[in-house]
């Protein structure tokens, strides 16, 4: 039996023998592409190559790509573990041609690999083609020799692929494997095609058209090929099993899942869920995603919680999920070294999230209890059930069981409708939704000279206006200029683009921003004088002060990154950065606020390196050599085969394409201005350097001097004076609260109380008190009366605030939230709450007496009924 590991290597070796360049898997996070949540196919890392935006030094590639389709092909997470082939995480085997070979070679390679390399029986293979793709039919029938009846024409979107609403697209051919007559299912294109007998194992996409905004298509100048074959699927075929979960890799994980959960049934779907989800979670965390309440972190959190729920379902009595990481590292760590490097972070993250989920369950139950108190009938809405599912991780059946215990039911159809809305959003989020034809797609190459000079003589190669190539541009017109060589740095790696001037005989162009398009550097700005034409010669001048200030901030981020790792730990990895002339911003992984003492340690460490005045050295070398030198590769960056390594003494060494100071001493001074959270597990530090750091220090000193002057204090007694003042304020606030309470008590004689049988009704407006005092008075009424309905308001200018209390014994007659709605309607306000307590406010105090009169009638009418 061929193992998954052997098959992975065999695929790579075969295509390397066909002159394909083996490229490593890209991250699960498609950086620089906001149209996609996760990398979900092998072609994602080559998207800009297919579009002609990015150039590579190879025209053929082979990859084994990490992919995530949070819930499988249709983003249906709940199918994972219950079907034979749904996964969250999977590996995609792929070979690619960028304007090199096309249909004949692509089909031939696939057929040879399947029938010769891994020796699949020809009689087990079927293929589909796009209905009108006669060229593909001829290759299969005439060149490969496949019988006509084994080539199925499909006239649907299943055999036509597009990158988005516009851009590259084309037909595809799919290869299917027949698992045999003992498995249910029919051929592709038949009503029984969704069965498990005929399984798609390889999809070959022929990108030969460009789709325009009006729906029309034109031929691409260089047709390309994109293929994908799921490693897990083809492994199942070769290991003679009908389910992906029966292959060697999954069996090892399932056995470990059974061990740590103490599950009795090894065939439980829950163990498959856990085995699948540990791969998705571990690789997401290794690629820099941490659990959060939105975006990618939210998807990770849901996957973790689903695994935990299934573990509890089969018998887990303690935290267990992290215990599968060791087995995953054993199975896949040799191929994906980041699992080894990030093992500690993965395990700690899973432990913390499982502990958090246990608390979340408790919170969800509280929400459930609060919702059923406000029910008007015996049905919990689908919206509430979905909220419990989506926010608190409650599966529908758990909500239904809890409802059943209280004699209630749940609107399942409304819940499913909410689920469908979410699935549609996820499906749409997985598409490329950009009109690629509107992008500037320059095919020229600009040489960057800005590492060594800020002034360069150059020639105009291209001019764009409104995205269109033009021959010239006029005064006061915004345009984009491409030069043959330039000292201007284009925005990348978190560093903003340069500013400056392009000037020649009779013209001047102000550069406001600089971006990249493929190998072209785009100078974005406005012609403020004269006319600019193609082939004009000019002098490009970068504004030196912004560039030097930006360089100081960029070099400081390298020192900061290293200092964070030394002070906080190796887990403090960069998640993002912004470097301009005014400041630096650095985002990194850390799960709690940084204490003032640690910030001081970080600042001292960075400033020590600045005072050491280390030379900042640069070398260009291979990625492999750079890694051997210990260079830090930054999260989310794309690197070429040859990389630029920036060293600052022996303190910091990173891969970086940005601009830097010559010596660390040129940074001058480093000062942190803020530190805070931007997402769960992600912190942000903002800082300034050089003159701005000095000015920041002056500003803070001046504030302290002003405070000392106001308090008539000095350096020795300032802190004590502030503490004394705060204590006085605290005591005065207590006295004020006491006086307000006495004021309210004194007003009690004026508060109207009505008795309806054994029910006391209190409705009154009390001036000069706050909401807290009203709430305390409401609690006082409820503690002294078993049946009371109290409505208290207070006014300030035109504003109204109110608190409403209803004894628990009366909530079946009337609810505090309903009274709040009635009162709000008379004072231009809003309010709400639980059945026994509500509060709110309004903007019309003029009608308060009339409003309270109406509320009293509302209460009396309800309790008399």
UniProtKB/Swiss-Prot annotation:
The main location class comes to: cytoplasm
Q: Which Pfam families match?
A: DHHA1, tRNA-synt_2c, tRNA_SAD
Binding note for cofactor: Binds 1 zinc ion per subunit.
One cellular component term from this protein's GO annotations in UniProt: cytosol
Asked if the keyword Ribonucleoprotein belongs to this entry, the reply reads no
Q: Per the record's keyword annotation, is Phosphoprotein included, yes or no?
A: no
Task: Name the InterPro entries for this protein.
Answer: aa-tRNA-synth_II/BPL/LPL (IPR045864), Ala-tRNA-lgiase_IIc (IPR002318), Ala-tRNA-ligase_IIc_anticod-bd (IPR018162), Ala-tRNA-synth_IIc_core (IPR018165), Ala-tRNA-synth_IIc_N (IPR018164), Ala-tRNA_ligase (IPR050058), Ala_tRNA_ligase_euk/bac (IPR023033), DHHA1_dom (IPR003156)
Quote the SUPFAM superfamilies the UniProt record gives.
Answer: Class II aaRS and biotin synthetases, Putative anticodon-binding domain of alanyl-tRNA synthetase (AlaRS), ThrRS/AlaRS common domain, Translation proteins
Which cofactors are reported in the record for this sequence?
A: Zn(2+)
User: Which sites bind Zn(2+)?
Assistant: 554, 558, 656, 660
Where does the source fall among the domains of life? Bacteria
Matches recorded under CDD domains:
AlaRS_core
Q: Which UniProt keywords apply?
A: Aminoacyl-tRNA synthetase, ATP-binding, Cytoplasm, Ligase, Metal-binding, Nucleotide-binding, Protein biosynthesis, RNA-binding, tRNA-binding, Zinc
Q: Name one GO biological process term.
A: negative regulation of DNA-templated transcription
The chain's disulfide connectivity reads none
Q: EC class of this enzyme? A: ligase
Q: Which reaction does it catalyse?
A: tRNA(Ala) + L-alanine + ATP = L-alanyl-tRNA(Ala) + AMP + diphosphate
What is its subcellular localisation? Cytoplasm
Q: What is known of its domains?
A: Consists of three domains; the N-terminal catalytic domain, the editing domain and the C-terminal C-Ala domain. The editing domain removes incorrectly charged amino acids, while the C-Ala domain, along with tRNA(Ala), serves as a bridge to cooperatively bring together the editing and aminoacylation centers thus stimulating deacylation of misacylated tRNAs.
Q: Which PANTHER family match?
A: ALANINE--TRNA LIGASE, CYTOPLASMIC, ALANYL-TRNA SYNTHETASE
Q: Which family does it belong to?
A: Belongs to the class-II aminoacyl-tRNA synthetase family.
Which NCBIfam families does its entry note?
alaS
Q: What does this protein do?
A: Catalyzes the attachment of alanine to tRNA(Ala) in a two-step reaction: alanine is first activated by ATP to form Ala-AMP and then transferred to the acceptor end of tRNA(Ala). Also edits incorrectly charged Ser-tRNA(Ala) and Gly-tRNA(Ala) via its editing domain.
> What is the protein's name according to its record?
Alanine--tRNA ligase
Please report the organism this UniProt entry assigns to the protein: Francisella tularensis subsp. tularensis (strain SCHU S4 / Schu 4)
